């Protein structure tokens, strides 16, 4: 696969940024179509909860492990044992994903109400999420699609082929847009339940296409995996060893997100999760355009240099990545804070009114404070993964999740009950967002203290090297 070349990071990030712009444009059209079709309502919240849950479950079970462990292990196997061995590793991983994630998808389809309860347990009204449970029966299979797509993207990224993994969401968005555009006429002619089935089936079809469109590109790089299951594969054991600490971080994320969704339903009944979802579209835009592209391209080079024990290059890559992340994301965060309301006026169509715009804008103002820190935290995660040591990162995620969940419950839910008569629920909901910057920053300093000496002082490098090889 060649030696690392940090000069290609900017070029690769540029390609991904262009494709991400196209993806985000279609993503905005998708969100606008959703806002026009179902507005900010109980149906909208049900859709958001049910649609986010498959990705959360995939991340909880396998996602964090695959994202952090697959690429460096795959690159190591291909370099040391050749193409055939790396193909066997990929085939083994795909076989295990089909077994594990396929089983979880089946459980989600059968026991959908129980899965949805994990996101609404504080609301006390289980019947309000019946529609979410119905849609989740369609969405559960997405858990498997996300897992397979992650492996395909990881293989392509390892070969510095970023086109299809970045362009695939565009196809997903186009299909979902068509589903939402058809919601109103289908509901008018056949009833609302038929319209719900349309958007549920269309959303799942979009995720399937996002996964499947990457398969043809694998052959161009000589990747022809034979799907099988071998739990004794040394590469699989290395993947699990590296991924287990990541599992703790993923559990923390799942718990904190579940508490946030449940608290949102308490603080802002029926529409709380919708407020979060609409605000996060703007919040994730600069991250997707700049930070995600930069960290993805940088991750490949960091993994290669870590495999070669070239810690000076690792140091250079991490330092440059942090500087670029802050340089781009701080101005974007200020922009979101200043122009929150004008930006969210784009939603004001169909069933989405100005009161909804005000709620989403207030939430976005507080949430935007964490944007630069969020980008750096993601880069820290990529750096620890490239160095094959996720234990420190997982520990910091645990501390952060405890603090954030405590803040949400104390200031969002408890204060929400105390101040219920004031009807200032929008400001209380913003407290949920305000907790994110504080606890994100709590991850960065200790993580940086670990990463910086790793590349700076030779003695520490030797100590870390022994730890990684253990």
Pin down the residues of each PLM region.
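Membrane-embedded alpha-helical bundles of multi-pass transporters/translocases
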Residues: 1-470
